[in-house]
Amino acid sequence: MIDLTVARVTEIVGGALVDISPEEAAERRVTGSVEFDSRAVGPGGLFLALPGARSDGHDHAASAIAAGAVAVLAARPVGVPAIVVAPDPRTGDGGLTGVLEHDADGSGAAVLAALAKLAKAVAAELVAGGLTIIGITGSSGKTSTKDLVAVVLELLGEVVAPPESFNNELGHPWTVLRATRSTDYLILEMSARRPGNIAALAAIAPPKIGVVLNVGTAHLGEFGSREAIARTKTELPQAIMQSGVVILNVDDPAVAAMADATVARVIRVSRGSYSHPGSPNSPDVWTGPVSLDELARPRFTLHTRDPRAGATEIQLGVYGDHQVANALCAAAVGLECGASVEEVAVALAATGPVSRHRMQVTTRADGVTVIDDTYNANPDSMRAGLQALAWIAHGGTHDKNQPGSCARRSWAVLGEMAELGEDSITEHDRIGRLAVRLDVSRLVVVGGGRSINAMHRGAVMEGSWGLETVNVADPAAALTLLRAEVRPGDVVLIKASHSVGLGALADVLVGDGAIRP
């Protein structure tokens, strides 16, 4: 974070000084990071007192000060120097009530509202000094694209990007406050669970470059329809000023339509060839035919409208055909910021999975390949994961009977896709059937409930008999089964929504065998 006095922070957030005099607040400076975990606080830091599942941050204020924090941003006095922003029903909290699960009295919402004010002020000052902000949204692929963009932009300057998927009302402003005066590029993921979320995040740190990847069915339960999801994703292009740039994946018709919703310049990316110059959605950055290697890493030729750039071969270091659109968007960001096509190609080739549990492919010493894609799941990403599994297991083809293929036994260990609302039963049924159509050898459905039953039943109805498809109670039961029956050379995909907890299973399964160099 930029260097600010405690007095200035208090002024920005509209708080009151408690257990610290105005004179001392004018002298004390926040020179470290802003943290919501007291164990992460260091000298010069600012601690956010937020309610949690196991404890309330207000109860850890003293330990944060002892660790070097200069003050605590809190909703009530905490017995140590604090900036207090008590909940005020007359002014509201900017729609932040309910964001934190364990926030019965609204104290967490008050602190989040203050955090947003602080991040907004810091972002404005840094943008005035030359910072470029990139915002990324989409129903799937945000984190993978963020990681790719970060690696490309690191060629050009200092980059700040969120770890993992810090993309909500807490993670977004927290990431903004990681930026300093030496930061050149700030990359932000923007997620949404209700209309207005993306607009609110964009108002905190207005992006100069906005990227929209796709409109899918993630969080369909909250929005009610794909059209409502599209309207919310459109909030990002609408937030970009005329001097900015919007990058759209026009292979998704809902995203292509967003070009009409922005006053900014539009850069279109597509997997299709550039065959219709002048048509509304003719791309500015596009690929030739895409091929996959034996581990489903895409290779393609990158084309741009710049006649000086020519066509450039790119071999991605990440896994899955679905990564092509993410890489195209990352390339478009890099080119817009001044990277050459050759620099983009080198960066994308050198980048494997960065964030944990997202298409991490590991081959153990015994030849078992584990595809860990357990961070989250929705119908689109689940289909992509199954297609990658089939490709790797069938030796670089989706058809194990194709001449030259070297089929390996495949396992799909799948859990629930959360937040799909009324479509949950149908979507889980489709995934079960798809696993059979892709000739997955063994399908292990983890958990219980109507959606999981639909996935299991869908596979059975599609023709999976006997022990080819099983339903186990929990991740522990799945691990027991895998340890007993996985053989050297098998390929195992593990995927579900984060709440299912399959990430720990993937970690153990990978650790069961030394990794092949």
Curated annotation (Swiss-Prot):
Catalysis: reaction(s): D-alanyl-D-alanine + UDP-N-acetyl-alpha-D-muramoyl-L-alanyl-gamma-D-glutamyl-meso-2,6-diaminopimelate + ATP = UDP-N-acetyl-alpha-D-muramoyl-L-alanyl-gamma-D-glutamyl-meso-2,6-diaminopimeloyl-D-alanyl-D-alanine + ADP + phosphate + H(+)
Subcellular location: Cytoplasm
Gene Ontology cellular component list: cytoplasm
GO biological process assignments: cell division; cell wall organization; peptidoglycan biosynthetic process; regulation of cell shape
Top class in the EC scheme: ligase
Positions with a binding annotation for ATP: G138, S139, S140, G141, K142, T143, S144
Keywords of this entry: ATP-binding, Cell cycle, Cell division, Cell shape, Cell wall biogenesis/degradation, Cytoplasm, Ligase, Nucleotide-binding, Peptidoglycan synthesis
Function: Involved in cell wall formation. Catalyzes the final step in the synthesis of UDP-N-acetylmuramoyl-pentapeptide, the precursor of murein.
Protein name: UDP-N-acetylmuramoyl-tripeptide--D-alanyl-D-alanine ligase
